[in-house]
Amino acid sequence: MKAILVTVLALAMASRMAGAQQLQLPADKALEERIRTLDLAHAEAIFKGDAAALQELLPDDHTVNHPTNRIVQEKAELLKLIGSGVIRYTRFERRPEKFLFYKDMVVVMGDETVVPAPGAPNAGVVLRRRYTNAWMFHDGKWQLAFRHANNVPPPL
């Protein structure tokens, strides 16, 4: 009797854990292309300092764990940094590598190469970054809810 009870409990726990691990959805090629387009449009908007495009791509509470070792907590703060030249580039290349699909969210992970413009921190230095962007579907559209980017140190 004890062995049966242990077996039933083990199976119940295993099935519960398996269900909990099913958060990630299967790949969706059409959605991947849509998010890839948005992800690259975001990079282009940052590169060009296109405030109108960023207004559309970012929610008001957009948050960035920024490679300058600070957290930028709102779209308005980010736009102010772009307008003041703290965030400005002479080169910005983004290469999305991995897409993870969840209910109402797609996470994109990839690689970036940027060269900050004169007046910006690290001006003229080629910086390689790893990034993670979280795109969320809200109010009928996909927006970049939060982002993390970190500079990769050059090889020794």
Residue ranges and their predicted role:
Residues 6-16:
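Bacterial N-terminal signal peptides
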Residues 19-58, 63-156:
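A beta-strand edge to alpha-helix "cap/lid" segment located at domain peripheries
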Residues 1-4:
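Positively charged n-region of N-terminal signal peptides that target proteins for export
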